[in-house]
Amino acid sequence: MRFSIYRYDPEHDAQPRMQTYELDIEPAGNMLLDALLRIKDEQDSSLTLRRSCREGVCGSDGMNINGSNGLACITPLTGLKQPIAVRPLPGLPVIRDLVVDMTPLNQQYKSVEPWLNNADPAPEIERLQSPAQRAQLDGLVECIQCGCCSSACPSFWWNPDKFVGPAGLLAAYRYIADSRDQNTDARLDNLQDPYRLFRCHGIMNCVSVCPKGLNPTAAIGKIKTLLVKRST
């Protein structure tokens, strides 16, 4: 199989390049990450990428695969058009090769305060929810912060320091929707400006690339609805 892989070391390279590799590997039963690790182990130890769990859980191996963001560890080689083009997630600074600087994503994630705010005295056991209340969080808590969604979003490319992005806004709604949280008004205040939320234009790139099948666009729409209702 043939692979065309993005190579760039900012400390030594004047500009990025695509490097071609050929690997004798059976597509059936193998994921893209399997091939990349074999290339690194057998052909070019300088190839740099992130990986950890290899099960689509940690989110560390997000990359752009034949023009679409995804996780290398759960992307089957079967069906990928050759040469398989592998690039870093777009819109983020490249540290080296397929490794990007996640700081812009992490800063926006932190800005929505992704933790429960509850002023009541802490109970001796966990704060309880009914099954119906917990069901409100389905499709929200499964996010693994891989960055595939925000790095597929043109609005996030345009100004990552102002627009929170799909990943951060999904997290924001996850806590707005949580019955145990008491900070809804402050959370909405935090998003009520022309950029942080309303730069989302609903093109749904985030939905099409999410490896967990989540819908950040729907969550963003619900936040917009809450803000509109609050202002009327």
Regions of interest found by a model, annotated:
Residues 44-50:
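Active-site phosphate-binding and catalytic loops of NTP-dependent enzymes
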Residues 24, 65-67:
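Short strand-turn-strand beta-turns centered on an Asx-Gly dipeptide
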Residues 1-21:
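Eukaryote-biased recognition of intrinsically disordered, low-complexity regulatory segments
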Residues 19-30:
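Short, contiguous acidic and Ser/Thr-rich linear segments
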Residues 53-62:
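Short, structured protein-protein interaction patches enriched in aromatics and acidic/basic residues
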Residues 30-42, 87-232:
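Ferredoxin-type iron-sulfur electron-transfer modules in oxidoreductases and energy-metabolism complexes
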